[in-house]
Design a protein with these regions (language model features):
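NAD(P)-dependent short-chain dehydrogenase/reductase
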Residues: 8-63, 70
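Active-site His/Glu-centered metal-binding helix of metallohydrolases
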Residues: 5
């Protein structure tokens, strides 16, 4: 309710004082750095696969997957570009099933003990309309396959720099102080 109220207040600010705004409602954001909350499960699953740990994504079904860099670009552009009006956009990225996401994960980690169980997420998994990208001048979000590959590359680069991903994974799960 607070988010909807904020969107409506933004419309009033535009109507009464000419203050422009963009509200962005992202779907499941995944990729390096996305490690908190239930919706971080796809990223945690990829990290688990990278460190050869088992993991279960706690939801199934259709999901809109938004790569973290694509989300960041949109938020930065929304805050830094000039426009008129009070806009609200869903940011759905690439609609896919969790099963499809797991298949892409297993392309990179064939022996990974990663699975999914549970109810579907209660959000629509629809394609982006393109209206946000048109307003702020960005290309479409990257395909899920590319985002998964970029996440794998990011984790491998972190390991090559000496980041202890196994420890980071355990910390993400709350298993280390």
């Amino acid at each position: 309710a607070h988010k909807i109220c904020g969107e409506q207040m933004a419309a009033v600010y535009w109507q009464d004082w000419g203050v422009p705004s963009i509200g962005i409602r992202p779907a499941i954001i995944y990729g390096p750095g996305r490690d908190q909350g239930m919706s971080a499960a796809p990223t945690i699953a990829l990290m688990a696969a990278e460190v050869s740990e088992a993991y279960t994504i706690p939801f199934t079904g259709d999901v809109g997957f938004v790569y973290v860099e694509d989300a960041a670009e949109r938020f930065i552009a929304a805050a830094s570009r000039s426009f008129e009006g009070a806009h609200v956009f869903d940011l759905n990225g690439t609609p896919a099933t969790v099963t499809e996401m797991l298949a892409l994960l297993h392309n990179h980690y064939p022996d990974a003990a990663i699975e999914a169980t549970g109810d579907p997420m209660p959000f629509p998994a629809e394609a982006n309309s393109g209206a946000l990208e048109q307003l702020i001048g960005l290309d479409d979000c990257r395909p899920l396959e590319t985002g998964i590959a970029d996440t794998v590359t990011g984790f491998q680069a972190a390991k090559a720099r000496g980041v202890d991903l196994a420890d980071m994974y355990q910390h993400t799960l709350g298993k280390t102080p």
